[in-house]
């Protein structure tokens, strides 16, 4: 069981199998989950609901994770520290600098369910 049960999580993932696996894993561990298939859907959900953590694929067609993050920074700045990027590729070394030096957690695939849950708990435990 996670340290922080009942966390409200928005999963933004264009790959259906990955999105469903994240949804299942997080729900199985006691969290509330909404899913979006792209950045535009995510922005609509952000306008309607409150979230503790946003898990976003970094590389998506259309609005990618970086664009979504910038929109979150402008529209919901209190949520920017709650974003976690999920990616199969390693970000380039200048990646953190693009966000003003703020450490944006990156969960690199493949990862274990335990690692996923630990990253979420770490984000929620941060004093933001």
Each language-model region and where it sits:
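Non-catalytic signal-transmission and effector/linker regions of two-component phosphorelay proteins
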Residues: 1-8, 101, 112-128
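Conserved acidic carboxylate
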Residues: 13
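Acidic, metal-coordinating helix/loop segments flanking the phosphotransfer/catalytic sites
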Residues: 35-53
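Acidic catalytic/metal-coordinating carboxylates
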Residues: 38-41, 64-70
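Receiver (REC) domain active-site loop signature in two-component systems and cognate sites
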Residues: 60
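Hydrophobic/aromatic residues positioned on beta-strands within the core alpha/beta folds
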Residues: 84-87
